[in-house]
């Protein structure tokens, strides 16, 4: 089935019914996708401040009301506890489980943060003629923990996570221009070229997602990634945090064109 041409609400319904459980890259072309962080209210201000201080890695699209599983703006009929293909639960910084629903874990003090995802600009890259390798290879995007320190806020501190896409040399400028127009979904790359400069020792062994082929004449290009909060959570070890599983996003009703240059 070609999910790229489906409406976001249709795909969310399939996810809620358990009919889609894999990565969402390439789905609902032209619509923004969002990373998810759910944490107790007592940690919400610190995380909001962390996101504000690290807008490249954590560009906020929406924050929920306390205890609410619904959103007001980016996906009004969404259920935050059921409309993502796969969730991760961290307790004291340790990954304790992955679930297709977190309804059974929901608490009245939870606050949800929806963070822009680079999957959003992939349809723009494809439209501009720039290849997206993990879509070609039908796998998840490779993601790496770097040596780039995030700006700390409250209890939150740690290293930035990046996503990597191999780009032909002659299309790097185009890819920077296309993605730079969309700062709400990470914007321009944080690094282009030699992976070791940002602390990546083996480009074939991502910390999250899948390895992809880098062809002759291509260079690895790295964008800030909304999996950064998961790296931070593993570092600071709060009692409980729920996130999306890397590559498994909330598909919003917000069109890419509406968040360009914003």
UniProtKB/Swiss-Prot annotation:
Keywords: Lyase. Belongs to the D-glutamate cyclase family. GO terms for molecular function: lyase activity. Pfam families: D-Glu_cyclase. The keyword Lyase applies. It is an enzyme of class 4 (lyase). This is Putative hydro-lyase Cbei_2760. Its EC number is 4.2.1.-. Gene3D superfamilies: PSTPO5379-like (3.40.1640.10), PSTPO5379-like domain (3.30.2040.10).
């Amino acid at each position: 089935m070609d999910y790229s041409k489906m409406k976001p609400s249709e795909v969310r319904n399939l996810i809620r019914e358990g009919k889609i459980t894999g990565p969402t890259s390439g789905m609902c072309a032209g619509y923004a996708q969002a990373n998810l962080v759910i944490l107790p209210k007592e940690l919400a201000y610190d995380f909001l401040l962390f996101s504000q201080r690290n807008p490249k890695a954590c560009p906020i699209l929406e924050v929920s009301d306390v205890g609410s599983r619904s959103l007001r703006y980016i996906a009004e009929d969404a259920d935050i506890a059921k409309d993502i293909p796969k969730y991760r639960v961290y307790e004291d910084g340790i990954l304790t489980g992955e679930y297709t629903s977190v309804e059974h874990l929901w608490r009245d003090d939870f606050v949800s943060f929806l963070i822009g995802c680079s999957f959003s600009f992939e349809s723009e890259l494809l439209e501009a003629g720039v290849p997206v390798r993990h879509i070609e290879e039908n796998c998840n995007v490779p993601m790496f923990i770097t040596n780039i320190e995030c700006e700390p806020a409250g209890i939150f501190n740690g290293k930035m996570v990046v996503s990597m896409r191999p780009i032909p040399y002659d299309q790097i400028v185009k890819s920077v221009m296309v993605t730079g127009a969309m700062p709400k979904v990470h914007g321009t790359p944080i690094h282009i070229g030699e992976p070791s400069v940002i602390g990546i020792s083996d480009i074939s062994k991502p910390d999250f997602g899948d390895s992809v082929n880098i062809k002759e004449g291509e260079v690895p290009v790295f964008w800030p990634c909304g999996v950064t909060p998961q790296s931070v959570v593993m570092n600071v070890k709060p009692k409980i945090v729920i996130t999306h599983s890397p590559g498994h996003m909330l598909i919003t009703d917000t069109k890419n064109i509406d968040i360009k240059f914003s």
